[in-house]
Protein backbone atom coordinates (compact mmCIF):
# COMPACT_ATOMS: atom_id res chain seq x y z
CA UNK A 1 0.00 0.00 0.00
CA UNK A 2 1.34 3.43 -0.94
CA UNK A 3 2.15 5.83 1.87
CA UNK A 4 -0.40 8.44 0.78
CA UNK A 5 -3.15 5.83 1.08
CA UNK A 6 -2.35 5.26 4.74
CA UNK A 7 -4.17 8.43 5.79
CA UNK A 8 -7.40 6.86 4.58
CA UNK A 9 -7.08 3.81 6.78
CA UNK A 10 -5.45 5.57 9.73
CA UNK A 11 -8.05 8.29 10.03
CA UNK A 12 -9.92 6.66 12.92
CA UNK A 13 -7.82 6.61 16.10
CA UNK A 14 -4.14 7.05 16.66
CA UNK A 15 -4.00 4.27 19.26
CA UNK A 16 -5.22 1.63 16.82
CA UNK A 17 -2.49 -0.24 14.96
CA UNK A 18 -2.89 -1.44 11.38
CA UNK A 19 -1.63 -5.02 11.11
CA UNK A 20 -2.61 -5.72 7.53
CA UNK A 21 -4.23 -3.71 4.75
CA UNK A 22 -5.40 -4.84 1.33
CA UNK A 23 -7.04 -2.94 -1.48
CA UNK A 24 -9.00 -3.86 -4.59
CA UNK A 25 -10.63 -1.72 -7.26
CA UNK A 26 -14.22 -2.64 -8.02
CA UNK A 27 -16.33 -0.85 -10.65
CA UNK A 28 -13.79 1.99 -10.61
CA UNK A 29 -13.87 2.53 -6.82
CA UNK A 30 -11.42 1.37 -4.16
CA UNK A 31 -12.32 -1.03 -1.36
CA UNK A 32 -9.94 -1.46 1.56
CA UNK A 33 -9.92 -4.32 4.05
CA UNK A 34 -7.88 -3.49 7.14
CA UNK A 35 -6.97 -5.64 10.11
CA UNK A 36 -6.55 -3.51 13.22
CA UNK A 37 -5.37 -4.02 16.78
CA UNK A 38 -5.28 -1.94 19.93
CA UNK A 39 -2.16 -3.83 21.05
CA UNK A 40 1.06 -2.13 20.04
CA UNK A 41 3.64 -4.89 20.08
CA UNK A 42 3.86 -8.27 18.38
CA UNK A 43 5.17 -9.72 21.66
CA UNK A 44 2.09 -8.52 23.51
CA UNK A 45 -0.20 -9.95 20.83
CA UNK A 46 1.62 -13.31 20.85
CA UNK A 47 1.31 -13.56 24.64
CA UNK A 48 -2.42 -12.80 24.54
CA UNK A 49 -2.98 -15.31 21.71
CA UNK A 50 -1.34 -18.02 23.82
CA UNK A 51 -3.85 -17.13 26.53
CA UNK A 52 -6.70 -17.59 24.06
CA UNK A 53 -7.42 -13.89 23.65
CA UNK A 54 -7.90 -12.52 20.15
CA UNK A 55 -6.32 -9.13 19.60
CA UNK A 56 -7.47 -7.81 16.23
CA UNK A 57 -10.48 -7.26 14.01
CA UNK A 58 -11.23 -6.55 10.35
CA UNK A 59 -12.87 -3.37 9.14
CA UNK A 60 -13.54 -1.91 5.72
CA UNK A 61 -13.48 1.33 3.78
CA UNK A 62 -15.24 1.94 0.48
CA UNK A 63 -14.55 4.86 -1.84
CA UNK A 64 -17.71 6.78 -2.63
CA UNK A 65 -18.53 8.52 -5.87
CA UNK A 66 -17.12 12.02 -5.34
CA UNK A 67 -20.09 13.91 -6.75
CA UNK A 68 -22.33 12.11 -4.26
CA UNK A 69 -20.69 13.81 -1.27
CA UNK A 70 -23.82 15.81 -0.43
CA UNK A 71 -25.97 12.68 -0.68
CA UNK A 72 -24.57 10.88 2.35
CA UNK A 73 -26.46 11.47 5.55
CA UNK A 74 -24.27 9.18 7.63
CA UNK A 75 -25.61 7.27 10.59
CA UNK A 76 -28.52 8.79 12.41
CA UNK A 77 -27.13 7.16 15.53
CA UNK A 78 -24.34 4.67 16.01
CA UNK A 79 -26.57 1.71 16.83
CA UNK A 80 -28.70 1.47 13.72
CA UNK A 81 -26.08 0.83 11.02
CA UNK A 82 -27.98 2.60 8.26
CA UNK A 83 -26.44 4.63 5.46
CA UNK A 84 -28.93 7.07 4.00
CA UNK A 85 -28.50 8.41 0.47
CA UNK A 86 -30.47 11.45 -0.68
CA UNK A 87 -30.44 13.02 -4.12
CA UNK A 88 -33.09 15.59 -4.97
CA UNK A 89 -36.41 14.01 -4.11
CA UNK A 90 -34.97 10.47 -4.07
CA UNK A 91 -33.91 8.78 -0.85
CA UNK A 92 -32.53 5.31 -0.38
CA UNK A 93 -31.45 3.56 2.80
CA UNK A 94 -29.55 0.33 3.09
CA UNK A 95 -28.14 -1.58 6.01
CA UNK A 96 -24.61 -2.95 6.26
CA UNK A 97 -25.17 -6.42 7.66
CA UNK A 98 -23.47 -7.30 10.94
CA UNK A 99 -21.92 -3.88 11.33
CA UNK A 100 -21.68 -2.30 14.74
CA UNK A 101 -19.96 0.85 15.83
CA UNK A 102 -18.37 -0.16 19.11
CA UNK A 103 -17.15 2.39 21.60
CA UNK A 104 -15.20 4.39 19.04
CA UNK A 105 -18.32 5.60 17.26
CA UNK A 106 -20.04 6.39 20.55
CA UNK A 107 -17.25 8.27 22.31
CA UNK A 108 -14.93 9.56 19.61
CA UNK A 109 -17.56 10.46 17.03
CA UNK A 110 -15.82 8.64 14.20
CA UNK A 111 -17.76 9.45 11.03
CA UNK A 112 -19.23 6.90 8.70
CA UNK A 113 -18.19 9.22 5.88
CA UNK A 114 -14.43 9.79 5.63
CA UNK A 115 -12.97 12.48 3.39
CA UNK A 116 -9.24 12.79 2.74
CA UNK A 117 -9.66 16.06 0.85
CA UNK A 118 -9.68 14.46 -2.59
CA UNK A 119 -11.70 11.29 -2.20
CA UNK A 120 -14.72 10.36 -0.12
CA UNK A 121 -14.87 7.09 1.84
CA UNK A 122 -17.42 5.18 3.85
CA UNK A 123 -15.93 3.20 6.73
CA UNK A 124 -17.23 0.48 9.00
CA UNK A 125 -16.08 -1.91 11.68
CA UNK A 126 -17.41 -5.41 11.42
CA UNK A 127 -16.18 -6.93 14.65
CA UNK A 128 -14.66 -4.15 16.65
CA UNK A 129 -14.23 -6.13 19.83
CA UNK A 130 -11.06 -8.24 19.91
CA UNK A 131 -12.85 -11.34 21.20
CA UNK A 132 -14.58 -11.66 17.82
CA UNK A 133 -11.44 -11.60 15.68
CA UNK A 134 -12.21 -14.68 13.63
CA UNK A 135 -15.89 -13.90 12.97
CA UNK A 136 -15.37 -11.98 9.74
CA UNK A 137 -12.80 -12.68 7.05
CA UNK A 138 -11.00 -10.49 4.54
CA UNK A 139 -13.19 -11.94 1.77
CA UNK A 140 -16.37 -11.06 3.65
CA UNK A 141 -15.18 -7.46 4.05
CA UNK A 142 -14.59 -7.24 0.29
CA UNK A 143 -17.97 -8.83 -0.47
CA UNK A 144 -19.75 -6.28 1.72
CA UNK A 145 -17.76 -3.45 0.15
CA UNK A 146 -18.88 -4.59 -3.30
CA UNK A 147 -22.50 -4.49 -2.12
CA UNK A 148 -22.02 -0.89 -0.99
CA UNK A 149 -20.50 0.12 -4.35
CA UNK A 150 -23.32 -1.65 -6.21
CA UNK A 151 -25.88 0.13 -4.06
CA UNK A 152 -24.36 3.56 -4.71
CA UNK A 153 -24.13 3.04 -8.46
CA UNK A 154 -27.62 1.56 -8.59
CA UNK A 155 -28.93 4.63 -6.78
CA UNK A 156 -27.24 6.99 -9.24
CA UNK A 157 -28.91 5.34 -12.23
CA UNK A 158 -32.47 5.25 -10.84
Positions of predicted regions on the chain:
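Charged, compositionally biased non-catalytic regions
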Residues: 1-16
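Amphipathic, interaction-prone secondary-structure segments
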Residues: 14-87
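Short, internal acidic amphipathic alpha-helical interface segments
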Residues: 61-120
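Ampiphathic alpha-helical segments that act as solvent-exposed interaction surfaces
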Residues: 100-158
Amino acid sequence: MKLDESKIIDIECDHIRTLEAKKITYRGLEIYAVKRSIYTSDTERAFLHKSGINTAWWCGYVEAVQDMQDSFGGRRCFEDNVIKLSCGNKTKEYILANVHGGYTYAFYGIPLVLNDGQRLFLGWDYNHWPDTEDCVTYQEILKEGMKVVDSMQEFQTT
